[in-house]
């Protein structure tokens, strides 16, 4: 049976009426549900929500003004971006621009049917547009309601569509969880073998401080007021926001040769190892990466080019393995933003075996890297494929005959 014939069989010849969303739903402003506290903590129990990608901003211990979605689920809708979420648990709201949307009559229109249909609409958000979208736009959009004159039949059709999409959603979430678990297992396995390979008995090899292993470079920020430093720049200017990868060959920002010549930032040769030395991320991890191209750094970064007879890949793997130890030894105490004490960083010691042993270790770890990276790269692709498959069937289930008067 084809997908279209399934929808036709589901409708079984019934009439479909396209009704304005504002006629079948109602909304509530979030005023009495807005969170007052600014500090959230994972030990608290009430989620603080936004309709955007972040969704759960944190947790609060406030006990008043809780929206009880556990009793009656709700759609939260961002009045500016049109982002929306299905919520079936109690929460506090963060933004006054959020609307809580519910069905006018649960005996005629299933709210989750509305939610799934709402997500078939293309985003109309425009950067800088501060127009309130629900009243001026979305409440007037028309949603297909099968046989509205027969609520029992209508709810049966809506329920079947919701059931199918719930199943697709659950399967997609299950697959994502399985792939993520596989990736985490591979990473743990890789970290274990890496740490074993980079562990040496006392006296077995020479130990050097990080300051002794190579030439270190600092970073700087060319003046933002000089357009000639930034416009049409071609030299990577790496900052902590670029350090989500272990191999870096591009950056979010680029600068010009003039900026290198006339500012505190310096051009660093290719095949350096960069680390973040000032960022809130240092409260959790020490980001490090192999920089494959000539590049510059901002002032929150440092990079090293190892001396002769010390392989860059060996130092890259070693810093990755010793990241937690380096943080414990060199992170400054106090201060509004976490940072690394350069003197303590440069005095941190690591084992440096002969170059043949370095090469052996690097070859083994590179093989593990290749395996882990293939899974890391494949995971988003597989998830994206499943999401597109889900969206295809979702849109198909809502492909009701549309009269010419409906222009959604």
Language-model-detected regions and their locations in the chain:
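Charged, alpha-helix-forming regions
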Residues: 1-408
